[in-house]
A protein has these predicted regions:
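Extended substrate/RNA-proximal surfaces in nucleic-acid metabolism proteins
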Residues: 2-88
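Charged catalytic cores and adjacent phosphate/nucleic-acid-binding surfaces used
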Residues: 26-38, 71-253
Length: 253
């Protein structure tokens, strides 16, 4: 099936990554995706830890799915903790469907994991997202191209950001760099004491900014003007970008 999908996907510019889900009881054990597998028939074992080891042995990158689903906290139960401690986990979902786990951003940073936002969709995207006026969740993979090799390299080096319902999550510097890649600043006028800039959002994503005053929405493909003392930089806290359980990046331009 994977080879058939990969052949058809070439006509649409889609990259199909072979994989398998390793699923057990969600509260006491958890759900995991094994990416870049070579033979799914060799993965299964009654022991979920051994199944994860089998996937890892064939070169798979394992992602921990929805770590807070059906749980009262995101703290890891025993089996899950063992999987982390053995180095079996390479990435983790900070968002799944409409769920967001800010505390998991800290885990990803501390353990060197890529972050992901996925739909876990069981219906059509139109019914679940577009009919509600929303875009589906996205994992932004900062890869050289969309080949399997480039995608894998980006995941291994944690070059991902997670996006869901207008919220971005990931590593602090990457969020800052992403914002600066989306936004341009142009000087309009300077009177020797103050400088006025035009600030443009060149992306299709919205940012929630807070400077020295009230937070405001910086909508896609719009501009605003900002005035600062000559020699000072523009500075905002990105309130819809999360780099930790209780932290947001601050950018200067």
């Amino acid at each position: 099936p994977v080879r058939l999908a990969q052949s058809a996907a070439q006509n649409y510019g889609i990259t199909v990554i072979p994989g398998a889900e390793i699923t057990r009881e969600p509260v006491s054990i958890g759900h995991f995706n094994a990416l870049f597998t070579t033979d799914n028939n060799l993965i299964y074992d009654r022991d979920p830890l051994q199944a994860l080891r089998n996937a890892k042995a064939q070169g798979a990158i394992i992602m921990h799915n929805h770590p807070g689903w059906r749980r009262t906290s995101v703290e890891s139960p025993e089996t899950e903790q063992k999987a982390y401690d053995e180095g079996l986990i390479g990435g983790v979902e900070t968002m799944n469907g409409s769920e967001f786990y800010p505390k998991i951003i800290d885990r990803a940073r501390e353990r060197g994991l890529f972050v992901a936002a996925n739909t876990d969709i069981h219906d059509s995207a139109t019914e679940t997202y577009r009919a509600q006026g929303q875009l589906r969740n996205m994992t932004l993979i900062l890869a050289a191209d969309n080949s399997i090799e480039a995608v894998r390299e980006a995941l291994e080096n944690r070059r991902t950001l997670a996006w869901s319902f207008g919220t971005l999550a990931g590593e602090e510097q990457m969020l800052k760099d992403f914002f600066k890649a989306c936004v341009s600043v142009r000087e309009i006028v300077s009177d020797g004491k103050y400088t006025t800039y035009a600030v443009t959002n060149n992306s299709s994503l919205e940012f929630m900014l807070q400077g020295s005053g009230t937070p405001f929405r910086f909508r896609p493909f719009t501009s605003f003007t900002a005035k600062v003392r000559k020699g000072e930089s523009l500075k905002w806290t990105l309130l819809n970008c999360w780099c930790g359980e209780n932290s947001h990046p601050v950018v200067e331009m």
